[in-house]
């Protein structure tokens, strides 16, 4: 069994959260970067014995369309998966539901979901003067 991180993290915040969570799971880790527009995601075949973490940010309360489309190309084969939605300055609204729909279509078995708060990527705390 190995841990597979499927991550869409254009600014690195979601990746940090994913690594923190997956780092608690004791196994070898493989990362699939959904930000790579040129990658052939259909080449990834996940084993039912693998544990998968799917992480992406919430953009305006929605899952990024590019991330969802790329996720749908990966064969989940019944592997257990945890969804992680990372959001900053507002609510995550439908993001987890959209991630769940895409993961199920890809053949993953959703076991848990996490909504994690991270620093807002457009307006980092270092730029806010209070």
Language model segments and positions:
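Extreme N-terminal starter segment of soluble prokaryotic enzymes
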Residues: 1-5
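Short N-terminal binding/cap micro-motifs at the start of the first secondary-structure element
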Residues: 12-18
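Long, highly hydrophobic alpha-helical transmembrane signal-anchor segments
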Residues: 124-125
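A Lys/Arg-rich helix-loop hairpin that forms a DNA/phosphate-binding surface
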Residues: 31
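A short, Lys/Arg-enriched amphipathic alpha-helix followed by its capping loop at the start of a domain
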Residues: 20-28
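Helix-loop-strand module that forms the ligand-binding subsite of alpha/beta enzymes
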Residues: 34-121
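Conserved small/polar residues in nucleotide/adenosyl-binding loops
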Residues: 128-130
């Amino acid at each position: 069994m190995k841990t597979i991180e499927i991550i869409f993290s254009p600014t690195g915040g979601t990746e940090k959260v994913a690594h923190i969570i997956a780092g608690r799971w004791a196994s070898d880790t493989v990362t699939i970067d959904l930000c790579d527009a040129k990658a052939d995601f259909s080449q990834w075949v996940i084993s039912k014995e693998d544990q998968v973490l799917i992480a992406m940010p919430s953009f305006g309360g929605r899952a990024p369309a590019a991330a969802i489309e790329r996720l749908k190309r990966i064969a989940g084969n019944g592997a257990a998966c945890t969804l992680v939605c990372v959001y900053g300055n507002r609510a995550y609204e439908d993001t987890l539901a959209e991630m769940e729909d895409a993961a199920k279509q890809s053949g993953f078995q959703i076991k848990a979901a996490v909504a994690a708060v991270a620093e807002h990527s457009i307006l980092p705390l270092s730029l806010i003067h209070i």
